[in-house]
Structure formats: C-alpha cells, structure tokens
Amino acid sequence: MDRGARANIRAVLTGETRSRWALVLGASSGFGEACSIALAKAGWNVFGVHLDRKSTQPNADRIVAEIAAAGRKAEFFNVNAADDAKRSEVVAAISRSCSGDSPECRVSVMLHSLAFGTLKPFFGEPRENAISKQQLEMTIDVMGNSLVYWTQDLFFAGLLAPGARIFAMTSAGDHIVWPAYGAVSAAKAVLEAHVRQLAVELAPHRVSVNALRAGVTDTPALRKIPGNEQMIERVQAMHPAGRLTTPADVAGALVALCADGAAWVSGNVIGVDGGEDIAGGR
C-alpha cells in the first residue's frame, strides 16, 4: 500500500474527511459516474446531480450504493441541472446537509460533466433539419454557461471551500470539426473561456479551475454523435497506446489533481487522452 493510500485511510478513520464533499453534475453515467466513485474511494462524500428516467434510475442507485460501500455519504438529485429553479433547490439542499454536518462542511471539488445538447448541422436539407436558434442557445447554455451559474451559486451561498478544485469536461471538439457537432463545439469553446475567467476571479480565494479534455471515450454521450462507430475505429487504429480513453482514466487524473501539490494548477485545458490529440487527431 502506498503512502497516499495509507494517509487517506488514516484520514477516514480519524474523521478528517467527514466534511469533504464533492459536487458532480452529470453523476449517473460516463465521466461523472467514474469520478463520483473515484472521489468517494479517495475520501469525498458526493452530491450528485443527474437526469434519469425510470428505466435508467437503477444505474444512479447503483452508483450511490458504490459510494456507500466506500464508506462515504451520497446525496443524489434527479433534476435538470440547467433549470434555474432546480439549481436553487439543490444548492439549498446542500446548504441544509452541510449545516447538519460540521462547521467546516463545504464543497471542495466540483465537476461539470453535462452532456445535453443538440447534434444537428448548421445547414440541413430540408431547412427543418438544420439547427435552430433555440437549440443552439440551449446547447451553449447547458454545456457552457451553466458552469458559471453553479459556481456562482455555491460561492455566494458560502458553500465553496477555500482551496476548492473545479473541473469542467471538454473535448477535442473544441478545435476539431465533427459532423453535426457545431453547437457542442461552440459550447466547449465557451466552457473553456469560462474556465479561464473563473480561474482568475477565484484565485484570491485559492480556488483552482481547469478543463479536462478527454480523448475519445465510449460513453452514452459519444454514442449519440453521428458517425461514432467510425470515430472509435479511427482512434483505435491511430492511438499510440492502441486503445480509447476510459472514464477511469479521467477519474484518476481528476483525483490526482485534487492533491495538495496540484493547487497551483489553474486556468488550463488539460489533455487526458494518452497522446491521442498529438498523434494526429481523429
């Protein structure tokens, strides 16, 4: 057992981590799922926000059970993370939970991993197949602007811990063109701009903000992109390591960036792709 693992076990046994909470937006699948479980194993309790129908709710329940099995607490909210009223309700619930925990209870890690948007070309035939103004604005708001809204609400509610780490999931679509990905690509560019601005404005509070650019990963979100099977085949053929990125790869990187020694890493887009991007793209 390495020194870090022993230190974490000591912290759990002595109660040092009892007030450490992470907030994961998009907690029930893909990157959000993997990061929720990894953070729990590293000593964080988890607030999870997800949007699931009855058919997919069992997976969210399984994640909660895995967090509990790691000896951590989990509070999951099945709501639309992009809805202003629902966001306020979740923040209020977090505040109530923290008030009953300890005076030190704050959110010390936040992950923005929302993958809800419109995948349509700008110029479709017929015109009805082209993306609309409403769809474009919705995609950018959900996948980009909501990072700011959630961070603001936590900050002004006094729930963002000094020294907190904020992460946002981006993709190579921020600089590579994929069919029907234009709105999401725009949202990722907006998201990365917000990461830079938040990093500067929150620096006096010792809060770091970074975007994680994952390589092509076989997630439910990827499966919605037109041509995803061909994309997977191309990446597997050209990747220097011969495989796709996995959610576990991203979760491991996120937990590593939560270490004390990584506090000075802020305002960056960090590639978590095993060299995929530099090896020739997609």
What is each of the regions a protein language model found here?
Residues 239-250, 261:
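A conserved structural motif in NAD(P)-dependent oxidoreductases
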Residues 115-204, 216-217, 278:
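Catalytic loop of short-chain dehydrogenase/reductase
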Residues 2-10, 255, 266-282:
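Short C-terminal tail/terminal secondary-structure segment
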Residues 2-109, 116-134, 224:
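Short-chain dehydrogenase/reductase
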Residues 208-218, 258, 271-273:
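Conserved SDR Rossmann-fold cofactor-binding beta-strand/turn motif
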Residues 59-61, 180-183, 204, 211, ...:
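A glycine/serine/threonine-rich, flexible loop-to-helix segment
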Residues 86-89, 138-141, 145-153, 196, ...:
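Conserved mid-core alpha-helix of short-chain dehydrogenase/reductase
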Residues 203, 208, 265-267:
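Short, small/polar-rich loop/turn modules that mediate ligand/substrate recognition or access, typified
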